[in-house]
């Protein structure tokens, strides 16, 4: 694999955890736990090949429509997993950032997020961006509200200025968006940042998306010609 032509920023919609669990007669919680294992493997592989930014779609603003028990279990997993991986962040130089409406989350989840961000803020091998309580439209709406409350004049507004009001404005646009699980849609993920992303839709359910499959998708990206409108 030619590392020079790899994407700088990869985003992944981790779809298929519940269907995987259902197919094996397991609870959705077990599906999410298995999905966490794949996520860690993908992080390790990204570090190995030199990808600098990796974004996971963890929980969307629309996911609140799910069963209360499932949401509670998922939030428990998120809060506990973030804190349990501090050694992993430090050993591998992983900087944690979070996109989404964090302030609307429960105190426990919010505290875990803030602790992870604070602990890893000086690491620089890989930026791991977790989209939690995230929706692309919601992010744009919050950015508009922040702009209106700022000192900027409307006539000065351009793409660069508007981007500065998005969550984590230091993040580059996505070069590659991968969605597992077989569905061909983007589900409100990073609407502003995927303008020129290459898209790959995999039929593989997320708990079965191993680094070998990820490697093939990265190679597929390398063979694509990106014109950026030219």
From Swiss-Prot:
Keywords of this entry: Magnesium, Metal-binding, Transferase
What domain of life does the UniProt record list for this protein's source? Bacteria
Which cofactor(s) are needed, names only? Mg(2+)
Q: Does the keyword Transferase apply?
A: yes
| UniProt GO MF annotations | ditrans,polycis-polyprenyl diphosphate synthase [(2E,6E)-farnesyl diphosphate specific] activity; magnesium ion binding
Summarize where substrate binds, as residue positions: 16-20, 60-62, 64, 66, 179, 185-187
Which residues carry out catalysis?
15, 63 (proton acceptor)
Uppermost EC category: transferase
Q: Which SUPFAM superfamilies match?
A: Undecaprenyl diphosphate synthase (SSF64005)
Which InterPro entries does this chain map to? Answer: UPP_synth-like, UPP_synth-like_CS, UPP_synth-like_sf
Q: What does this protein do?
A: Catalyzes the condensation of isopentenyl diphosphate (IPP) with allylic pyrophosphates generating different type of terpenoids.
Indicate the family of this protein: Belongs to the UPP synthase family.
Q: How does it assemble?
A: Homodimer.
Query: In its UniProt entry, what is this protein called?
Result: Isoprenyl transferase
Organism of this sequence: Borreliella burgdorferi (strain ATCC 35210 / DSM 4680 / CIP 102532 / B31)
Quick one: which gene encodes this?
Answer: uppS
């Amino acid at each position: 694999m030619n590392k020079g032509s790899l994407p700088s920023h990869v985003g992944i919609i981790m779809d298929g955890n519940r269907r995987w669990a259902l197919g094996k007669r397991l609870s959705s919680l077990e599906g999410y736990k298995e999905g966490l294992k794949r996520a860690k493997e993908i992080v390790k592989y990204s570090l190995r090949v030199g990808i600098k930014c990796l974004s996971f779609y963890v929980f969307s603003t629309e996911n609140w429509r799910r069963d209360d028990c499932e949401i509670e279990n998922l939030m428990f997993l998120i809060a506990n997993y973030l804190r349990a991986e501090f050694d992993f962040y430090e050993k591998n130089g992983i900087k944690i950032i979070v996109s989404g409406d964090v302030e609307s989350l429960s105190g426990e989840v919010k505290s875990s997020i803030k602790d992870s961000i604070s602990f890893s803020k000086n690491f620089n091998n890989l930026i791991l961006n977790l989209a939690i309580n995230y929706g692309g439209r919601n992010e744009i709406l919050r950015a508009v509200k922040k702009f209106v409350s700022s000192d900027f004049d409307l006539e000065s507004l351009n793409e660069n200025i508007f981007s500065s009001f998005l969550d984590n404005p230091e993040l580059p646009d996505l070069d590659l968006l991968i969605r597992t699980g077989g569905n061909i849609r983007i589900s409100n993920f990073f609407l502003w940042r995927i303008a020129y992303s290459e898209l790959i839709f995999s039929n593989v359910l997320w708990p079965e998306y191993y680094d070998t499959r990820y490697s093939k998708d990265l190679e597929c990206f390398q063979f694509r010609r990106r014109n950026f409108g030219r």
